Amino acid sequence: MEFWGLEVKPGSTVKCEPGYGFVLHLSQAALGESKKSDNALMYVKIDDQKLAIGTLSVDKNPHIQFDLIFDKEFELSHTSKTTSVFFTGYKVEQPFEEDEMDLDSEDEDEELNVPAVKENGKADEKKQKSQEKAVAAPSKSSPDSKKSKDDDDSDEDETDDSDEDETDDSDEGLSPEEGDDDSSDEDDTSDDEEEDTPTPKKPEVGKKRAAESSVLKTPLSDKKAKVATPSSQKTGGKKGAAVHVATPHPAKGKTIVNNDKSVKSPKSAPKSGVPCKSCSKSFISETAPQAHSKAKHGGK
């Protein structure tokens, strides 16, 4: 840095040149001694432009500070006719364009490098986090997935087994009952047909009426006995006893009320059935063979 200053006399113009490789900084202007109150308007001319930079007065502003920089030749002048004006400042070496380019490039590199480092750091952090998650996810999911698969397989096996067992049980439970129902229905229908179709041979009126009255009375008692007695008592029937049959309680047979005193309760009937003396048929109640013999064998 180099100090600089000059005097501009009244009515004159002074040329100033910063010099090669320097810039001139205009710092201050002061009004010289004057016996009269005088004002001085200062000008600077650069190329073809003339600009006013300030006004000095003995009473109010004897000096003014500036902050003007010039990098090429310029001219200073003022309007005072009685006193001179003094300008002061300093010169500074001007940085070359190459140096400026280097400085600018360095600044740009620094500005670019800082965000790049941040972005790279963020990217690295993101990559690390993603890798950690990717490593943690399979390790956590592998045992859970295996357990879930095993549980699903076991549940499916259990459901399949339970469904098969239920279907088997239902088939086994229904088949004997259906068979028993069919057999009991066939027995009932065959007995009813045999008992309800009497064929008397003798023309005797008294016996015929007695036979008809007995035939009409006995089927009702037989039917009541058949309804009251459980299917488990038909062990001496035509088709034999059924296996594992769900039957009503045998106690219900006790609640049957019959006004006919001649008809006995099913308890007196033997388990093997009452056989007919004339043929090989057997009946559950004791009165059924009598009606059968009267209807089929003519009361023998």
From Swiss-Prot:
<dbReference type="InterPro" id="IPR013087">
    <property type="entry name" value="Znf_C2H2_type"/>
</dbReference>
<keyword id="KW-0805">Transcription regulation</keyword>
<comment type="subunit">
    <text>Multimer. Possibly forms a homotrimer with HDT1 and/or HDT2.</text>
</comment>
<protein>
    <recommendedName>
        <fullName>Histone deacetylase HDT3</fullName>
    </recommendedName>
</protein>
<feature type="compositionally biased region" description="Low complexity">
    <location>
        <begin position="265"/>
        <end position="275"/>
    </location>
</feature>
<keyword id="KW-0804">Transcription</keyword>
<feature type="compositionally biased region" description="Acidic residues">
    <location>
        <begin position="151"/>
        <end position="197"/>
    </location>
</feature>
<keyword id="KW-0678">Repressor</keyword>
<dbReference type="GO" id="GO:0006325">
    <property type="term" value="P:chromatin organization"/>
</dbReference>
<feature type="zinc finger region" description="C2H2-type">
    <location>
        <begin position="274"/>
        <end position="297"/>
    </location>
</feature>
<keyword id="KW-0378">Hydrolase</keyword>
<feature type="compositionally biased region" description="Basic and acidic residues">
    <location>
        <begin position="198"/>
        <end position="211"/>
    </location>
</feature>
<feature type="compositionally biased region" description="Acidic residues">
    <location>
        <begin position="98"/>
        <end position="112"/>
    </location>
</feature>
<keyword id="KW-0863">Zinc-finger</keyword>
<feature type="region of interest" description="Disordered">
    <location>
        <begin position="98"/>
        <end position="300"/>
    </location>
</feature>
<comment type="similarity">
    <text>Belongs to the histone deacetylase HD2 family.</text>
</comment>
<keyword id="KW-0479">Metal-binding</keyword>
<feature type="compositionally biased region" description="Basic and acidic residues">
    <location>
        <begin position="119"/>
        <end position="132"/>
    </location>
</feature>
<dbReference type="GO" id="GO:0008270">
    <property type="term" value="F:zinc ion binding"/>
</dbReference>
<keyword id="KW-0597">Phosphoprotein</keyword>
<keyword id="KW-0539">Nucleus</keyword>
<feature type="compositionally biased region" description="Polar residues">
    <location>
        <begin position="279"/>
        <end position="290"/>
    </location>
</feature>
<dbReference type="GO" id="GO:0005730">
    <property type="term" value="C:nucleolus"/>
</dbReference>
<keyword id="KW-0156">Chromatin regulator</keyword>
<dbReference type="Pfam" id="PF17800">
    <property type="entry name" value="NPL"/>
</dbReference>
<comment type="function">
    <text>Mediates the deacetylation of lysine residues on the N-terminal part of the core histones (H2A, H2B, H3 and H4). Histone deacetylation gives a tag for epigenetic repression and plays an important role in transcriptional regulation, cell cycle progression and developmental events.</text>
</comment>
<dbReference type="GO" id="GO:0016787">
    <property type="term" value="F:hydrolase activity"/>
</dbReference>
<dbReference type="InterPro" id="IPR041232">
    <property type="entry name" value="NPL"/>
</dbReference>
<keyword id="KW-0862">Zinc</keyword>
